[in-house]
């Protein structure tokens, strides 16, 4: 009965968000707006003028971007809250939370694509710069759990290929974390806790003075310990046995950004600790990552801009018990990007990249310990993208990236599209793009007793067709997208041999479906959002390659009063996962993940000086208090692993000062 009411609520919010287009809301011209009012005005005006930078590497309207995209605004971040980046991304249309048995315990899948045991089909960017993990090929749990979300200005998500401009891993999606810019001086601190042992804290300092901009912040979280029973078949007798386990979920992160007259430096640190379930044995996995980028922009001519970037990232993982692994890998990337504007109708983007990756893995399950990976590889790429406006309402886009990865042959991936605005506020997009994911160091060179790399592997490939129709005005934003992806040369593990061997799958895989999204401001205070994803996937032999529900629906409702009281609720419905059933642990089931965020800004009531303030907030996740078990992706047994403990409640305080 309760599930039916929640499903009905989703439908009502979705229909409201996609059906009502009213008159423009009058804008407040006061220069003395507080932060909340400023955000209201920005987003009411910005729904029809949302600028994005990820699709083309320069600022353009969302309707002009040659990609299918979703944007999480600063206003949405403030209204709905979220302790981690994963919490926020699970609200994005077309994204679904996922998990695996070992290194990547926290992942998101874009439009159902989760064929790997890590997030290697998604490229994460920080202000446009890539953050890759090159040993396994895509671990991102530390970023999703520990990046300081309090510093985010917005998140741009490309749903579909992005390799023409971003290279390897920009396969089924790209997530660009865009941080805030300093204006004057801002100091902000928050702390929260709960009765079950949960705790979180964050701080941020933003300073702009004399052309120098400094943005600094940090975040910490500790989830309640989860005492549960995990059952497995992995033992000599092949009989089910139980393990009492206390599962951890902790993380910390920091970020620093310095900007001075075209010269930029940014760096981040993220660390996370969680559980692993390799061969059915419960253990701990700890990961940490350092990231740094030095960039410089200059104007070579009146219509020619250049950007130079040197990017470094290092990822370290430890599993001190079984599977007794220590990993250490890094990537150095040098990129030169050019933007040439020939006229109002013609624009060219081109650039080149050179990167070097290396990594080691030590297996200490035997004595003496074994060095099972010690690899390195060079890579390079050249990309070009051209856009031409045939008319004011019709634009053509085309591009290609040629790349050379290690000893592999030269290869290329293209993109092309047609963007048409047939009437005011309406836009149509017909896009095709290809992408690739290069084999990781482990996939080509691992010499573990249980798993061996294959030096003959070739990159995974995908080609995606997108057909999108959208409507935007200053109160509403609605889009419907049909997608069809054909993936080839997917890399899997052949577990029929001992040791297991990586290989390229011969049969292609197909993902297709409908992805729809709507956002609507009823008034300045009321905001609704909703989305529906339906996808199916298969290859020649398997009907459900990916452990992601075919049907998912999301809905959020938020009220932000002028007196500083915000109340928001969000429901994430995940349907039944076809083809996956657990034989001994709880089975994966359809569920509603309900969250709420309530904030009381007491500044107006208690402080006359608007430059200082404090607020109380209450945030709750998984309010139905239902434990979530998901398929044990990457294991040979039909089993599940524990992912979400149940209800988590935080009560916290924020204080800030602006100058």
Please place each PLM-identified region on the residue numbering:
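Extracytoplasmic beta-strand/coil segments of soluble accessory domains associated
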Residues: 53-62, 66-70, 86, 90-130
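Short acidic/polar hinge/loop motifs at secondary-structure boundaries
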Residues: 130-159
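Face-selective signature of the C-terminal outer-membrane beta-barrel domain
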Residues: 257-272, 288-410, 419-421, 476-480, ...
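Gram-negative outer-membrane beta-barrel transporters
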Residues: 389-395, 478, 482-486, 504-580
């Amino acid at each position: 009965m309760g599930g039916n009411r929640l499903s009905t609520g989703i439908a009502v919010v979705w229909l409201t968000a996609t059906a009502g287009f009213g008159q423009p809301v009058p804008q407040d011209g006061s220069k003395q707006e507080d932060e909340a009012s400023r955000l209201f005005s920005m987003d009411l005006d910005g729904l029809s003028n949302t600028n994005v930078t990820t699709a083309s590497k320069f600022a353009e309207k969302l309707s002009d971007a040659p990609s299918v995209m979703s944007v999480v605004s600063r206003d949405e971040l403030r209204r709905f809250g979220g302790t981690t980046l994963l919490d926020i991304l699970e609200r994005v249309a077309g994204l679904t939370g996922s998990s695996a048995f070992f290194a990547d315990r926290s992942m998101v899948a874009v439009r159902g694509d989760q064929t790997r045991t890590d997030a290697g089909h998604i490229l994460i960017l920080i202000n446009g710069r890539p953050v890759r993990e090159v040993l396994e090929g895509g671990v991102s749990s530390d970023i999703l759990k520990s990046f300081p979300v309090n510093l985010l200005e917005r998140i741009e998500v490309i749903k579909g290929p992005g390799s023409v401009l971003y290279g390897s891993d920009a396969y089924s999606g790209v997530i660009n974390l865009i941080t805030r810019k300093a204006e004057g001086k801002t100091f902000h601190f928050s702390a929260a806790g709960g009765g079950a042992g949960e705790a979180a804290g964050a701080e941020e300092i933003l300073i702009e003075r004399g052309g120098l901009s400094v943005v600094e912040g940090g975040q910490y979280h500790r989830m309640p310990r989860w005492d549960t029973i995990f059952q497995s078949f992995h033992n000599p007798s092949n009989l089910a046995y139980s393990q009492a386990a206390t599962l951890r979920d902790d993380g910390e992160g920091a970020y620093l950004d310095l900007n001075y007259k075209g010269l930029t430096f940014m760096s981040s640190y993220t660390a996370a600790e969680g559980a692993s379930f390799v061969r059915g044995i419960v253990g701990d996995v700890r990961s940490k990552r350092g990231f740094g980028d030095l960039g410089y922009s200059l104007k070579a001519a009146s219509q020619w801009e250049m950007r130079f970037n040197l990017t470094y990232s290092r990822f370290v993982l430890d599993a001190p018990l079984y599977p007794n692994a220590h990993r250490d890998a890094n990537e150095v990337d040098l990129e030169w990007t050019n933007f040439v504007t020939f006229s109002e109708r013609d624009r060219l983007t081109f650039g080149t990249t050179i990167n070097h990756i290396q990594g080691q893995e030590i297996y200490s399950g035997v004595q003496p310990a074994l060095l099972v990976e010690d690899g390195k590889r060079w890579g390079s790429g050249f990309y070009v993208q051209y856009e031409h406006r045939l008319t004011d309402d019709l634009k053509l886009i085309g591009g290609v990236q040629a790349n050379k990865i290690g000893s592999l042959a030269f290869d290329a991936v293209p993109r092309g599209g047609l963007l048409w605005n047939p009437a005011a506020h309406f836009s149509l997009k017909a896009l095709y793009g290809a992408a690739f994911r290069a084999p990781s160091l482990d996939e080509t060179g691992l010499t573990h007793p249980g798993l061996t790399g294959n030096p003959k592997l070739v990159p995974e490939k995908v080609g995606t067709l997108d057909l999108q129709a959208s409507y935007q005005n200053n109160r509403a934003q609605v889009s419907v997208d049909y997608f069809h992806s054909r993936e080839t040369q997917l890399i899997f593990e052949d577990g029929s041999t001992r040791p297991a061997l990586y290989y390229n799958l011969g049969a292609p895989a197909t993902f297709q479906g409908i992805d729809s999204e709507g956002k609507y401001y009823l008034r300045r205070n009321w905001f609704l959002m909703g989305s529906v994803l339906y996808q199916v996937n298969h290859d020649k032999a398997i009907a459900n390659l990916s452990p992601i529900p075919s049907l998912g629906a999301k809905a959020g409702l938020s009220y932000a009063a002028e007196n500083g009281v915000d109340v928001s609720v969000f429901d994430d419905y995940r349907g039944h996962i076809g083809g996956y059933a657990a034989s001994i642990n709880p089975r994966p089931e359809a569920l509603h993940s309900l969250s709420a965020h309530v904030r009381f800004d007491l500044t107006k009531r208690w402080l006359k000086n608007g430059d200082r303030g404090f607020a109380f907030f209450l945030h709750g996740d998984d309010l139905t208090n239902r434990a979530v078990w998901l398929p044990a992706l990457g294991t040979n047994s039909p089993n599940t692993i524990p992912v979400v403990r149940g209800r988590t409640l935080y009560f916290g305080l924020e204080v800030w000062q602006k100058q």
